[in-house]
Amino acid sequence: MQEYEKSESLYIVLISIHGLIRGHDLELGRDADTGGQTKYVVELAKALAKQPNVEQVDLVTRRIVDVEVGGDYAESVEALAENAQIVRIDAGPEGYIRKEELWDHLDSFADNLLSWLHGQPRWPNVLHSHYADAGYVGVRLSHLTGLPLIHTGHSLGRDKCRRLLARGLTMEEIEQRYHISRRINAEEETLSNADLIITSTGNEIEDQYELYDCYTPEKMAVIPPGTDLDQFHPPAASNASSAFAASLKNFLSQPDMPMILALSRPDERKNIVTLLEAYGESPRLQAKANLVIVAGNRDDIREMDDGAQGVLTELLLVMDCYDLYGRVALPKHHKADDVADIYRLAAASKGCLLIPL
């Protein structure tokens, strides 16, 4: 067991393995693995680094060498903010793979991360894992080093399995597609070994973690996600001239009508196809408001993964079936920094926001 230096200034290691993580222009919605968790961990690292008792924050993820996703993700170290950086660790194939295919490579990730930690000037005070795959790694590192482990689940396998079964999928289908048993086993192990579990809501503790054999509510604490008030603020007159607002004019016959906004990645679990069908079934709603669905970023749907391709194709088919041209916008691109403007645009239109779950 490694002895680590006790210091008043904290060195925190965040572990978030899957998806595309970088310090600028986050590609949120590019695929099912690059969503809210990506934004969360990057902002968390920056916020922690600003704390007066924090000396260093390292956000550790998987290094990806793949021309299909770009060179940023191949950099071993990327400066994130003062006292914060992204560290990328090799594990498994060089190319980008979805999180369900990472399980066989997590032991390698843990070994390589441990080697990297041994080469640093000081030992961390705490490990903070994010999602089941990082929890698997965090448990092993905690056992090897004696470091305390904090864990944030973000989403949970047992809850997901329950929802998929309710939609009519069989356990065999769920296992084949999501390797759900490996995920749930990792979550049970993490719950059993972590010193602290962070959740966003009390519901997460009472209704989701309660499904687990290793349910330990006394080790759980609710820390609601924060809001960047410099970015998220009420709409101003200048908001109407934003680039995103201009792009909607290519889709909408009456762009000044109230907006029903849905923003999510193109994932079948988000149920945005049903939203479009409901809008298509309601001429009264169509007369009152436009529907704007911001479903990630796309260049060529034919080159996207099967899940995103299926959702986007179905959206276009439903849009055509109900002849919703001029009433529905499905913009192809937006930047992460556009999200606040998109929300303000919906508010300024006196529309509403739907949260696909």
Residue ranges and their predicted role:
Residues M1-L357:
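Catalytic cores of nucleotide-sugar-dependent glycosyltransferases that transfer UDP/GDP/TDP-activated
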